[in-house]
Structures are given as C-alpha cells and as structure tokens.
C-alpha cells in the first residue's frame, strides 16, 4: 500500500508544480469528493429508494436541487478556487510541502485528529455568531433556504459565510504546515463528514452510530444520549433562534454550552 501511494505521489510531483498540486489539484479533488459523495442523495430523494431511512417526509423539487447545484458550481469556481490560490503563500510560509519523504501514518493521524478538534471548536463559535439576528438575516439564511437538507446543501452558503467559516477548516493546517497529502486527506474527510451531516438520512451504517461524540452517542457517567444526522436536520428545520448543533463534527460543544437542549427535549417527547 505504501509503495502504491509513493508511486502515485512520485508521478504527481514529477509532472506538476507545488502550486498546481496545492491549488488546482486540491480544487479538483474537492469537487470530485464533494459531488461523488453528495449526488447519490439526490438520486435517493428523487426515486424514493431507502425512503424508510429518510429523516423528513418532505422532499426537494428537481428545480430546487438544480438551483443548489448551479449556485455551488458558481461559488466553488468564483470563491473557493481563488481562496485556495490566495492561501497558498500562507501555507508555504507555514511549512507545507509536497516533496518526499511522505509523512508516517502516525503523524498524519495525529495531525488530522488535531484538525478535527480545532475546526469543531472554531466552527461552533463562528456558527453561533452567524445565528445572531443580523448575520442570520443577511448571511446565514442563505444556507438555511433548504429546510429539508440534502448532501449538497452542506456547502450551499453566502460567499461571506464561505470565507468566514472556511477559516475554521484551514486554521489547523495553517498552524502545523502539513504535507500536502495530509491536507488532501483532511479535506476529503471533512467534505465527506459535512455531506453526511446534511444528507437527510440516518442509516444503520451511519458513522454517528459507531463513533462516540461524532454527532452520535454522548455517554456520560450519569446518562447517555444518542444523536444522529437528525440533530443537524433539526437545526435546519428551525429559525435562527437557539436550535442547536452549531458544531461541525462532534456533539460535546453543544452539550457543554447547552445548545442541544431543544433537540433533547424534542427527542424525549417523541419517545414518551
């Protein structure tokens, strides 16, 4: 496996410059992972396949789905790509490299765990700020246009929000100056995670069923509580008020600061 990865990476660094890999390569990888992981949920919603796992009974119209895709392509090309290009000198200054040797899996794993933790913390507070009345009305309400979210709506947002919350995603890598392959793996995992959180389905194989604190189970000495993709779906069904699930990946921040109380009460009522 290592030799396969090394061979593939050798081909990339031989045929492309650092700038091309870090900017154009990252953009192509992001678009590929994002749409390949998100488009299947449009198929599920349109066909009704696996509808017993759908969180809401309502579905989006093909027109609404098409609008989302068109806006995403526009913003990805006009906001995301320029942002990647503009941030390249910063990452290079902080130590990012693409040359050999490749980092060990221990280093990669430790860095990505750090990125998830710091991204979740920064995203939580940034997301709460976006739910203040003025910012919600003028910026964040764009993301909440889809009260019935599907995978691709995870990145459907106002350009200002893309820049604002995008900081949470890049702050970890900017601090550590990782190898580009680590940055790519982090980006892939983060994209898959946010698509899953907005997918509108909760399957038996959903990660939240198996990974503690990952939008899943919060187990304490005195209680346990099961979260799921339904937690963020609940967030989209409500207005800018305290609707919870401000975190991006984990659930402990919502629990610590009490922003999961409304969801927990709703779950308790449904179970009685």
From Swiss-Prot:
Record family assignment: Belongs to the sterol desaturase family.
GO cellular component: a single term: membrane
Misc. remarks from the entry: Requires a membrane-bound cytochrome b5 as an obligatory electron carrier from NAD(P)H to SMO.
Motif (Histidine box-2): 140-144
Observed effect of gene inactivation: No obvious phenotype. The smo2-1 smo2-2 double mutant accumulates the 4alpha-methylsterols 24-ethylidene lophenol and 24-ethyl lophenol, and is embryonic lethal, arrested in early stages with an altered endosperm development, probably due to disturbed auxin flux and responses.
Pfam families assigned to the protein according to its UniProt record, in alphabetical order: FA_hydroxylase
Protein source organism: Arabidopsis thaliana (Mouse-ear cress)
Notes on the domains: The histidine box domains may contain the active site and/or be involved in metal ion binding.
This enzyme's EC code(s): 1.14.18.11, 1.14.18.9
Tissue expression notes: Strongly expressed in leaves, flowers, siliques and developing seeds.
GO molecular function, one term: iron ion binding
Protein name, UniProt field: Methylsterol monooxygenase 2-1
Fatty acid hydroxylase domain ranges (all copies): 113-259
Top-tier EC class: oxidoreductase
Positions occupied by motif Histidine box-3: 231-237
Residue ranges annotated as motif Histidine box-1: 127-131
Domain of life: Eukaryota
Compartmental location: Endoplasmic reticulum membrane
Bilayer-spanning residue ranges: 24-44, 72-94, 107-127, 162-182, 209-229
Alphabetized UniProt keyword annotations: Endoplasmic reticulum, Iron, Lipid biosynthesis, Lipid metabolism, Membrane, Monooxygenase, Oxidoreductase, Steroid biosynthesis, Steroid metabolism, Sterol biosynthesis, Sterol metabolism, Transmembrane, Transmembrane helix
Reaction catalysed by this enzyme: 4,4-dimethyl-5alpha-cholest-7-en-3beta-ol + 6 Fe(II)-[cytochrome b5] + 3 O2 + 5 H(+) = 4alpha-carboxy-4beta-methyl-5alpha-cholest-7-ene-3beta-ol + 6 Fe(III)-[cytochrome b5] + 4 H2O; 24-methylidenelophenol + 6 Fe(II)-[cytochrome b5] + 3 O2 + 5 H(+) = 4alpha-carboxy-ergosta-7,24(24(1))-dien-3beta-ol + 6 Fe(III)-[cytochrome b5] + 4 H2O
Task performed by this protein: Together with SMO2-2, required during embryogenesis, probably by maintaining sterols and auxin homeostasis.
Topology in membrane: Multi-pass membrane protein
């Amino acid at each position: 496996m290592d030799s396969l990865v090394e061979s593939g990476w050798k081909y990339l660094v031989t045929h492309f410059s650092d700038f091309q890999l870090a900017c154009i390569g990252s953009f192509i990888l992001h678009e590929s992972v994002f749409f390949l992981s998100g488009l299947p949920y449009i198929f599920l919603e349109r066909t009704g396949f696996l509808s017993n796992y759908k969180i809401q009974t309502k579905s989006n119209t093909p027109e609404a789905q098409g609008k989302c895709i068109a806006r995403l392509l526009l913003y990805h090309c006009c906001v995301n790509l320029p942002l990647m290009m503009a941030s390249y000198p910063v990452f290079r200054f902080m130590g990012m490299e693409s040359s050999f040797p490749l980092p060990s899996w221990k280093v990669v794993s430790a860095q990505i765990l750090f990125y998830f933790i710091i991204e979740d913390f920064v995203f939580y507070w940034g997301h709460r700020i976006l739910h203040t009345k003025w910012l919600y009305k003028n910026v964040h309400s764009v993301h909440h246009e889809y009260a019935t979210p599907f995978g691709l709506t995870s990145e459907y947002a106002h350009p200002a929000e893309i820049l604002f919350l995008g900081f949470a995603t890049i702050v970890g890598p900017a601090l550590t100056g990782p190898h580009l392959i680590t940055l790519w793996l982090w980006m892939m995992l983060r994209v898959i995670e946010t698509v899953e959180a907005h997918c509108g389905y909760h399957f038996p194989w959903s990660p939240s069923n198996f990974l503690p604190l990952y939008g899943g189970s919060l187990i304490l000495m005195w209680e346990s509580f099961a979260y799921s993709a339904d937690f963020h779906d609940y967030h989209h069904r409500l207005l800018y008020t305290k609707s919870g699930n401000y975190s991006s990946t984990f659930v402990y921040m919502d629990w610590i600061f009490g922003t999961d109380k409304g969801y927990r009460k709703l779950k308790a009522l449904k179970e009685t």
